[in-house]
Curated annotation (Swiss-Prot):
Pfam families: DUF188. InterPro entries: UPF0178. HAMAP family: UPF0178. Belongs to the UPF0178 family. It comes from Rhodopseudomonas palustris (strain TIE-1). This is UPF0178 protein Rpal_2485.
């Protein structure tokens, strides 16, 4: 069991792995907070909390970033939110299982900004590839690994 101080935050509006988060969180007895711009349906469970952050631009992102702390985990595809959370000392994981780290977040943000610029000029069209079963499996592995890593860190003598 992991220290109850670890909380999993989910940027929930378009998250394709909410069910996987519920299962892993229940197995490790971790609280989950799903944050969305509006109402989302979540299972009734004492470990799961739903937050409607409001419809303002980046309202859900701001809500998460203002509360996340070292030892917490955020699930998001939003690279600027991931950057804010990593800077706060949290673990950030994309729904496809890709971890955002202090070492990778700068380059990831730069590539995101470049792609945004290229799309706005019409040089690139289309979006990311479809979410796959392999992405789901990679995500489950990444989340489980992150939880175990945080638990080891907290259990280590200081």
């Amino acid at each position: 069991m992991t220290d109850a101080l670890t909380r999993i935050y989910v940027d929930a509006d378009a998250c394709p792995v909410k069910d996987e988060v519920y299962k892993v969180a229940e197995r490790h007895h971790l609280p989950v907070t799903l944050v969305a711009g509006g109402f989302i349906r979540v299972p009734q469970h004492p470990l799961i909390e739903r937050v409607a952050a409001g419809s303002g631009m980046d309202a859900a992102d701001d809500w998460i970033a203002e509360r996340i702390k070292p030892g917490d985990i955020v699930i998001t595809a939003d690279i600027p939110l991931a950057s804010r959370c990593v800077k706060a000392g949290a673990t950030a994981i994309a729904p496809n299982g890709k971890p955002f780290t202090e070492e990778s977040i700068g380059m990831t943000l730069a590539v995101r900004n470049l792609m945004t610029d290229l799309r706005s000029t019409g040089e690139i069209t289309g979006g990311p590839r479809a979410f796959s079963p392999r992405d789901r499996s990679t995500f489950l592995s990444a989340l489980d690994s992150a939880i175990r890593r945080i638990a080891r860190r907290r259990a280590a003598p200081t």
